[in-house]
């Protein structure tokens, strides 16, 4: 319902219990999903790669959350999941602080964790139910992210509203929303007669402001994957001034197509595209990009090398905040 589509394209659904997704001793389902993501990312043609990985509910310990976060980060997908279903804002703050889920590890930038579960349906008193049925918010948020421009965070009154959701587990005051948001969670809020997400945060709390903001991470991952795909198609061409000029022209053309108020980035500059003078099979590419939010400048650094197999090229990316 939140995808605003009659039918969602390019989706894979895995029928698994939470116990199966959190079993590190017998990681059959973890390995299956990891292999599915890798199969569509670790290849030359990236047109069928995934963008979102949704695991509704609470994964539990940091060992499990980090396992999934590393899988998401290594395949450049955004993991959406949920914190525990607790009954008060104070419980969320206390338990999340003690759980220590946020951190400065780079893979935390690929994790979105919601809190304050959504009302699924009212309790049925006639059959002895004592509480309403509450469901995790990550799936609804993922649908909204799917249908929203990648550079726009799904948060606030205009863009964060969720379809067909009547209420949440508990009400939140403005100060409580701010405290929960600062911790790295995405609270679900019932205000203005609608339920909405009210944060743009990932679980990354390091110095790089862009990696704290999921729209920036998604845009950078998308740009990196497009460039990986494009450069893979140009692998093993002899490096000449004409090759360099042609690559630069094509990259600028792509970046120009995603620049502007209704697109993905505010502005860009290709700072470097060159062959490593000391290692001829290595290509270095630095792009200076300013996303719309936050209003900071960042550098995407791509490094490519010829692989061991014919027609194989290995690419690595790094996102750094411009000083």
Model-derived regions, located:
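Long, low-complexity, polar/charged, intrinsically disordered or flexibly structured peripheral segments
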Residues: 1-32, 37
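Structured, hydrophobic secondary-structure cores that serve as assembly/anchoring elements
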Residues: 39-323
